[in-house]
Swiss-Prot record:
Keywords: Calcium, Cell membrane, Cytoplasm, GTPase activation, Membrane, Metal-binding, Repeat, Zinc, Zinc-finger. Residues 317-545 form the Ras-GAP domain. The gene is Rasa4. Residues 1-105, 116-232 form the C2 domain. This is Ras GTPase-activating protein 4. Binds 3 Ca(2+) ions per C2 domain. One of its GO terms (molecular function) is GTPase activator activity.
């Protein structure tokens, strides 16, 4: 049994932000922090007070996280970025919105007294005495304190207040992981109701000390327990009233927290086997669970259910059969060929998810070079005469501005060149298209041709394929390359217009250049010769694409499996330390890294024949490094065991917080099942004769901070998690259980009356009855897990805090 938490985050837009630049504008971006740890940075939107981001993220976290905060920043090229304001959502607030938090929220000022993080290790006890008892507080150590000084560290000390007395620890210089091991005694009066207050501070020689956090302990509860020891989370100081600083603007967010208790695999086997049996039966037998699931799934959660089902069947090797069943169901209720797969049905949503899960690398290979060219050229492109702005295009010759006709002709030439290059890339891609996608399109093509065999519908099988390949895959990726991981930043206005016109042309080709699509925007006429040629090319491509037999499919799949693509790759800066000499950022060397399911390798270039490998099975942790260690906040460490079992560390520098977290996520997910994973680590480096983080002199000393192996970002190429997918399906079915029971009663009544439901030759209620029994068994299994001693164990440390 494992408890898992995930956050679905959509950062939509901001409005009415204050101007931070002398031009009266700002260059805003967002930083997302979980428990004050940066995990996401959005793109910067330049010169605006009402930025639109539209960025989506899925973050997997341990269930013990407390807050997620959104900081709106103003990017500055020459000085430190300005903080505009923040929105903070607690875990409890998110849990109170099961369907997710959505809407506009006012930004508030960032108060230093609320910017706290970390934990403090205390041992508290009541010591009996002859005349009076004493309250003893041992301040042992702290970890992950907020860095308050410019050097990326703090100089922490602790104040302990009780019963009118204040005592202090010594100051530990330049450490966010201090160890004090100091004990303080206070007289304990009978019936005392005052709390014991433990405050952490950053000592400053010149300016005021900075607040690092506090813990307030309920002494009455401590008297009952007599003694407690553990790590207490530092809390912000909210005793001072917040001073308003005018309107800081608003942020539109969509955030959903999902907590799941994932049971052992054996618990989900009956559910998975039942669903797989239904897919194998198809539309021939009495199994009708998939249609019932579709009917009871609301539009708002259809995409999520489709993705989960698709991943579940992909893991069982039945994705093609599942999609084929959905194709047949959709065709069975479609009478008009021109409406086929145009709705947001389960079939359409499942096919969308399938292409993203199985075909993203294929998409990148086709679109990547063309999208890069459009971004790099930054040409002004416009075909609509009503939108042409001659001033935007400069001059074609000396002292003579371009005419509108010249602008339109030049734009048409640019778009034709991009379209020809794109069609050429598509037509050459038959052999690089994943075999499972080709086989699925083959089934779709055949099913549609069987359903609409007349000559007047000869284009319908092609349009069925292009409705997914072009309209729901290529065109959206061209329109929004960042959402498909083709670019790190959104396009500017000029590039966006070029991409929009190119996407429209691809849609026209995907629609097989129908008169309706031509009539909508007559100004697209200059592209018509290329579009007509593209239709012929695309038809030829589709015929080759679907011309795949089962043996060829298996051979291609085996070849693909034997040449597993990298999980992640790209250039990074490396520093390998043997504990000799000083460590500095200048000692980093740029190399090309590649992470596969077998190893992390690095070489001078991506094409180098000689590489160095770190076996994936030998990785023990992948963690961030303190900013003060190298003067950069974008450095991670990979701790691994060498051939003789000794711990070694390699330090890698990334270019930004997003790249850092993407590499950390990839490494953590790839090594999640490794033996010997570390539970603690040193976020600093061993410089000279001690660790820079906690100042301990033993190089083999246990780490001073917890590892974060469960903090990961969801990516399109994540490995399938069969148990989690089964749990998500169970959770959805549990939510529609009442509708399933109602459907079961109707089917049972019809069978008893001797009326067989349309399309069912057997007893469809048997499948539903099995499903309802499986749901009941899983409900009982979850109930047993919640009733276990570990689940019921009280959180003493939380109860002690006031």
């Amino acid at each position: 049994m494992a408890k898992r938490s995930s956050l679905s985050i959509r950062i939509v837009e901001g409005k009415n932000l204050p101007a931070k630049d002398i031009t009266g504008s700002s260059d805003p971006y967002c930083i997302v922090k979980v428990d004050n740890e940066p995990i996401i940075r959005t793109a910067t939107v330049w010169k605006t007070l009402c930025p639109f981001w539209g960025e989506d993220y899925q973050v997997h976290l341990p269930p013990t996280f407390h807050t997620v905060a959104f900081y709106v920043m103003d990017e500055d090229a020459l000085s430190r970025d300005d903080v505009i304001g923040k929105v903070c959502l607690t875990r409890d607030a998110l849990a109170s919105h099961p369907k997710g938090f959505s809407g506009w929220t006012h930004l508030v000022e960032v108060d230093p007294n609320e910017e706290v993080q970390g934990e403090i290790h205390l041992r508290l006890e009541v010591v009996p005495g002859v005349h009076a008892s004493r309250l003893r507080c041992a301040v042992l150590e702290a970890r992950d304190l907020a860095p308050k000084d410019r050097n990326g560290a703090s100089d922490p000390f602790v104040r302990v207040h009780y019963n009118g007395r204040t005592q202090e620890t010594s100051v530990v210089k330049k450490s966010c992981y201090p160890r004090w091991n100091e004990t303080f005694d206070f007289e304990l009066e009978k019936g005392a109701s005052e709390a014991l207050l433990v405050e952490a501070w950053d000592w400053d020689l010149v300016s005021r000390n900075d607040f690092l956090g506090k813990v307030a302990v309920n002494v009455q509860r401590l008297c009952s327990a007599q003694q407690e020891e553990g790590w207490f989370r530092l809390q912000p100081d909210q005793s001072k009233s917040r001073q308003g600083k005018g309107n800081l603007g608003s942020l539109q967010l969509e955030v959903r927290l999902r907590d799941e208790t994932v049971l052992p695999s054996v618990c989900y086997q009956p559910l998975v086997q039942l669903l797989c049996q239904e897919v194998k039966l198809g539309t021939q037998g009495p199994g009708r669970l998939i249609p019932v699931i579709e009917e009871t799934t609301s539009a708002e959660c259809r995409q999520e259910v489709a993705t989960t089902l698709l991943k579940l069947f992909l893991g069982q090797g039945l994705a093609k059969d599942f999609l084929d069943l959905l194709f047949q169901l959709e065709l069975g209720r479609t009478s008009e060929a021109n409406t086929l797969f145009r709705s947001n049905s389960l079939a359409s949503k499942s096919m969308e998810s399938f292409l993203k899960v199985a075909g993203m690398r294929y998409l990148h290979g086709i679109l990547g070079p063309i999208i890069d060219r459009v971004f790099e050229e930054k040409k002004y492109v416009e075909l609509d005469p009503s939108k042409v702005e001659v001033k935007d295009v400069g001059c074609s010759g000396l002292h003579r501005p371009q005419t509108e006709a010249e602008v339109l002709e030049q734009s048409a030439q640019t778009l034709r060149a991009h379209l020809v290059a794109l069609l050429s890339a598509i037509c050459r891609s038959v052999r690089t298209c994943p075999a499972i996608i080709r086989a699925t399109f083959r089934q779709l093509f055949r099913r549609v041709r069987e359903r609409f065999p007349n000559a007047q519908h000869q284009n319908v099988p092609f349009i069925a394929v292009t409705s997914f390949l072009c309209l729901r895959f290529f065109s959206p990726a061209i329109l929004s390359p960042k959402l498909f991981h083709l670019r790190e930043r959104h396009a500017d206005a000029r590039t966006s217009r070029t991409l929009l016109l190119l996407a429209k042309a691809v849609q026209n080709i995907g629609n097989m250049d129908t008169p309706v699509s031509r009539a909508k925007e007559s100004w697209m006429e200059p592209l018509q010769p290329t579009v007509r040629q593209g239709v012929a090319q695309l038809k030829d491509f589709i015929m080759k694409l679907v011309d795949i037999e089962e043996k060829e499919e298996l051979d291609l799949q085996r070849a693909l499996n034997s040449q597993a693509p990298p999980v992640k790759e790209g250039p990074l800066f490396i520093h390998r330390t043997k504990g000799k000499g000083p460590l500095a950022s200048s000692s980093f060397k740029k190399l090309y890294f590649s992470l596969t399911t077998e190893a992390l390798s690095f070489a001078k270039t991506s094409s180098s024949k000689k590489s160095t490998f770190i076996k994936l099975a030998s990785i023990r942790a992948a963690e961030k490094v303190e900013e003060k260690s190298f003067g950069s906040s974008h450095i991670m460490q990979v701790i691994y065991a060498d051939d003789v079992g000794r711990a070694q560390t390699v330090y890698l520098q990334c270019k930004c917080v997003n790249e850092l977290n993407q590499w950390l996520s990839a490494l953590r997910k790839a090594s999640t099942n490794n033996r010997g994973l570390l539970r603690s680590y040193h976020p600093g480096i061993f410089r000279g004769d001690k660790w820079s983080c906690c100042h301990q002199k033993d190089k083999t000393d246990q780490g001073c901070d917890k590892t974060h192996s469960r903090v990961t970002l969801q990516e399109w190429n994540d490995p399938l998690d069969h148990d989690l997918e089964a749990q998500l399906i169970y959770r959805h079915l549990l939510g529609v259980e009442a509708a399933l029971r109602e459907r079961y009663q109707l089917l049972r009544g019809a069978t008893e009356a001797g009326v067989s439901p349309t399309g069912c030759d057997g007893a469809p209620e048997d499948s539903l009855a099995q499903l309802l029994r499986v749901l009941q068994d899983l409900r009982e299994a979850h109930g047993s897990s919640l009733a276990s001693p570990a689940a019921r164990e009280p959180h003493h440390l939380l109860e002690l805090q006031t």
